[in-house]
């Protein structure tokens, strides 16, 4: 997907998991990065998978929903190779493709619940995917519900700002940092960031305003 192995998100978490498994089981592993970085196409992703298979990979692990088309093509062509699709959906008829998805709404619920129980009552949420990414939407829905549940228990009122506007590309931006900084200046105490590297924009705004951030995917402190 987009990003790199130091993105404090899916790529880093997936690669760390591959390394742990491989080292614990005396397996070899190698990272194949699609050409053109964040502008990679389906063909670029397929070429990276093909290179892995050509070099003898028995299992290919791909992270992120943008891998879907390339994975389907590769799994159809290389039937003797196993493919693992992190944050994806299964494809009918492809028995060599295993898809792993998550219940992001549960994670979001815990984040919202914990934030309010910690004493925060003015919350923010920034999601990736421009509002069309199911996983990021589930994080947001759970976050609101968790905050509401904790607020009811504590008998307090909670304010919530939320946006998916500047996270469509999952990349940091000056616009998102400005938006988050404005929230903080107007009283928002903590923002839950769900969308890959948009986390960098939120943390920059938080640092400038001595405020708090909730991360996701992997430890982002």
Segment roles from a protein language model:
Residues 1-221:
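A residue-level marker of the well-folded mature domains of exported/periplasmic proteins
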